[in-house]
Design a protein with these regions (language model features):
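Secondary-structure capping and boundary motifs in well-ordered enzyme cores
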Residues: 212-216, 220
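Hydrophobic/aromatic-rich core segments of domains that either
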Residues: 219-294
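Short, well-ordered strand-loop elements centered on a beta-strand within folded domains, enriched
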Residues: 140, 144, 208, 212, ...
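N-terminal accessory/pre-domain segments preceding catalytic cores
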Residues: 4, 13-177, 294-401
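Secondary-structure boundary elements
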Residues: 151-209
Length: 401
């Protein structure tokens, strides 16, 4: 890299590397399956740890840029928003040695993460380098250069494949779908078309999902965000940890003005199998809906947030999958159970999943359906054996039909 000095004198250079892969994420899902220095002159210090913004913008342009950027951008101070735009523009236009408005390395790292959280389409960035320019022991400026996983020709080729996937996916979305239907459709589509694979290349970005059809949680979450944004639904990336302390990624979405969490990875049966959840053979629900549009309280049972920026408290259950689909029990109700089983048989479903509002209702359901074996009243199983799974943390249980 070219060394630049403000004045003649001795210079020193130190190199290192910061990659974006700070989230090598797996996660753990609990589910049970059962049968019944200083220099005399200028010093430039370089470490490895995006188009230049116009000198001025009109108020309308500022608003437009803010609308085009995401959730994290909107929750930064004005100073950090300026830094955010400098970093974002440098990354998307492949600019080098861009002078930043901040000389705080921790702030630069934080805002860099905000940019990546808001922009899953910047899939080709794997880190950045910064250069410190000092006069004596006084830091004068920092410049920024992105580090890229692919060259621009490769990026264009991959983007074509990504566009093909997105067009195929969205072409099958129901016409006039409301936001809940869009979220549910994309959740299901990604699960049906993706296998959990910690060994696949590019598993921290959307290429693994859209090109390889295999990924880990950050790939799932960024793909979910990308598709929902393309479909006109707000979605952003959320980082945190799950049971066991492993890094994890999922999404925050907005439906009818209310925020919900979505974890597409934990909804995928292939993750449940790889995660060692105890399912034998093929006895795994194809899709686990426990993590489709859930409130903060429910998510906190298994997930812990790393607040890159402040996140809202999700309190609504209106767009929760089980509520919208009629599988949610606020009290033990035999008629509701009978209706659900009957309708799912009529639809040819492979299994039924029931979810309860509380541990108390869950225990009532468990006592009736399992302990007293009343589930056989609703099942067509002449052999007298039923396979089921339960998730005590989420107060849900599934029965195979």
């Amino acid at each position: 890299m070219v060394c630049c000095l403000l004045r003649e004198g001795v210079h020193m250079k130190r190199t290192g590397l910061l990659l974006t892969g700070m989230l090598i994420v797996t996660g753990c899902l609990t589910y049970a399956w059962r049968t019944l220095p200083r220099q005399e002159s200028d010093l430039y210090l370089q470490e490895n740890v995006g188009a230049k913004q116009e000198e001025s913008e009109s108020a309308e342009q500022v608003v437009q840029r803010e609308q085009e950027d995401g959730y994290a951008y909107g929750r930064l101070s004005e100073e950090k928003q300026e830094l955010y735009l400098e970093i974002r523009d440098a990354l998307v236009q492949f600019d080098e040695d861009v002078k930043l408005s901040s000389c705080d390395k921790e702030e630069i790292s934080h805002v860099f993460q905000c940019v990546l959280n808001d922009h899953p389409e910047i899939f080709y960035v794997e880190g950045y380098t910064y250069t410190e320019y000092t006069l004596g022991d006084i830091l004068k400026k920092i410049t920024f250069t992105g580090s890229y996983r692919f060259d621009q020709e490769e990026i264009a080729e991959k983007q074509k494949l990504i566009d093909d996937y997105v067009n195929q996916c969205l072409s099958g979305m129901p016409e006039n779908a409301d936001d809940y239907t869009k979220v549910k459709y994309i959740y299901e589509y990604l699960i049906h078309h993706t296998e959990y694979d910690a060994e696949v290349e590019d598993n921290q970005n959307i290429c693994s999902v859209f090109i390889e059809g295999r990924s880990v949680c950050q790939g799932y979450a960024k793909a979910t965000q990308y598709l929902l944004n393309k479909a006109g639904v707000f979605a952003t990336l959320v980082l945190g940890r799950v049971v066991g302390g492993e890094g994890h990624a999922w999404n925050l979405v907005q439906i009818d003005g209310q925020y919900y969490y979505v974890d597409t990875t934990w909804g995928d049966a292939s993750y449940q199998a790889v995660g060692g959840t105890g399912y034998p053979g093929e006895k795994i629900p194809t899709i686990n809906y426990d993590y489709l549009c859930v409130p903060t309280a429910q998510m906190n049972l298994t997930h812990t947030l790393d607040n890159v920026v402040e996140l809202p408290e999700c309190n609504s259950m209106e767009a929760n999958y089980y509520v919208r689909e009629g599988f949610y029990f606020t009290e033990w109700n035999e008629e509701q159970v009978e209706r659900i089983f009957r309708e799912e048989y009529e639809k040819g479903s492979a299994y039924v999943t029931l979810k309860c509002v509380s541990d108390g209702v869950y225990r009532q359901m468990q006592e009736a359906l399992i302990d007293r074996q009343e589930v056989f009243r609703y099942l067509d199983c002449p052999e007298g054996v039923v396979s089921y799974s339960d998730n005590e943390e989420q107060y849900s249980m599934s029965f195979w039909l």
